[in-house]
Amino acid sequence: MIKMTVYELSKNSQFNVLTMPEPERETDGVYIGDLLSWVMGRARENNVWITIMSNINVVAVASLSDVSCVVLAEDVTLDSDVLATAEQKGINVLSTPLSAYDAAVLLSGM
């Protein structure tokens, strides 16, 4: 994956912006995981975190892990109150119809 901003990543037609309070945040690598405690200990700063989890804890884990953005795979969405919290905490959230695997493959080629 070439380093790029979240804004640049979002320009790919496979990604939909749900909230992007920090569009200039740099990306560096990808982490795929749904077990939140596992993600907290393994996702790295500026990673793109791909998940199918869809609750408020996603925002907390993204903040603690300092990922550049969360990508919700398989058209998963977040409730409006969760998106508002993500916006407030500076967490970029995108969605994609792709599976987590296919999203990671796409990102690896960007």
Each language-model region and where it sits:
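Conserved catalytic and cofactor-binding micro-motifs
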Residues: 1-42, 93, 102
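Feature captures the catalytic cores and cofactor-binding loops of soluble hydro-lyases/lyases
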Residues: 24, 36-48, 53-110
